Regions:
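Intrinsically disordered, low-complexity
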Residues: 1-44, 119-148
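Secreted/periplasmic proteins that engage bacterial cell-wall peptidoglycan
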Residues: 23-93
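...with weaker cross-activation on analogous glycine-rich loops/strands in unrelated enzymes
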Residues: 33, 65, 71-148
């Protein structure tokens, strides 16, 4: 069962908390959204996803690494501090990673994908989830992959 396409470059949060895939999204973005949706409601585990992309649960950098790997732009998991140097500086058109020494999250097609309890609660679980609240990015390195 696939995620329905929406007729803009912005994803939406569907009932149940998963994200839609925007019509016209490039293949790496489609793969990223589908990968993020796979982790929806997975348990938050500190250090989860650091050793392998397959884990029982994920922390912030494990979840972001999993999604970037699915998009084809990351070979092995990185921790938050390493993600602050991944890719190129500045925001991307489709995927932007926000990272500092202790936390990371990403914005894909206009939705924030995060594990932190800050902002709007779409899902009360502690694991990776989508939300509309983007945040300011203050205190974070802003990174993207060329072309995305």
């Amino acid at each position: 069962m696939g995620e329905p396409a929406v007729p803009t470059n912005l994803a939406t949060i569907l009932p149940g908390g998963k994200a839609s895939v925007p019509a016209g999204a490039p293949a790496p973005v489609v793969r990223a959204i589908k990968a993020a949706n796979k982790l929806h409601r997975k348990t938050y585990i500190g250090g989860g996803g650091h050793r392998s992309f397959k884990a029982r649960g994920y922390d912030c950098s494990g979840a972001v690494s999993y999604v970037l790997h699915a998009a084809g732009v990351l070979r092995s998991p990185l921790v938050s501090g390493q993600l602050a140097y991944w890719g190129s500086p500045g925001p991307g058109s489709w995927i932007t990673v926000y990272a500092n020494r202790t936390h990371t999250y990403m914005v894909i097609a206009g939705l924030r994908y995060d594990t932190s309890p800050r902002g709007e609660w779409i899902d009360q679980g502690r694991g990776p989830r989508w939300r509309y609240t983007l945040g300011t990015g203050a205190g974070f390195a802003v990174r993207h992959w060329q072309g995305l």
